[in-house]
């Protein structure tokens, strides 16, 4: 089983989230027809296999742990799909509210829940991803992958290992002391202007 360290954003979101205020990213799509539950489950499984971070779970830690780690499971621990039938807009809204009010656990993979709402005017697929695991763009990519898998369309992924490019400091951090000083000057100027 592979592991990858938490980056700075993972750490921040883990420590900000509270049980009474779950931090999740919620996206949904409505289709004009019917979504087949069996095909959707297959699409969810295929998406988990395609995206390593979709199979990530929080690695247990102990007193000697220096950094939090994600464990990348070979497969999901569960398939988090709830299926409901709604006859009114209020029932659709209730399904949505149920989904977004849940604190999606990161100790099991995947760290997201999906709800399929069957409705006479068209079905809904709702997705809620723990914000510690994914931001809005990552959640959009995950939903896009689920939809492509469902439709049997190609779902290309980059030809690099996504677990090796999660270090935000290496990607966007200052590369030298002068650059760091310049960034601090800009930050101080921004804070000074914002305070006025």
Task: Annotate each predicted stretch with a short phrase.
Residues 1-174:
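Non-catalytic N-terminal regions of enzymes
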Residues 173-182:
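Primarily interfacial, aromatic-capped hydrophobic alpha-helices that serve as membrane anchors
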Residues 182-196:
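Flexible, P/S/T/G-rich "lid" or insertion loops adjacent to the active sites of thioester-utilizing
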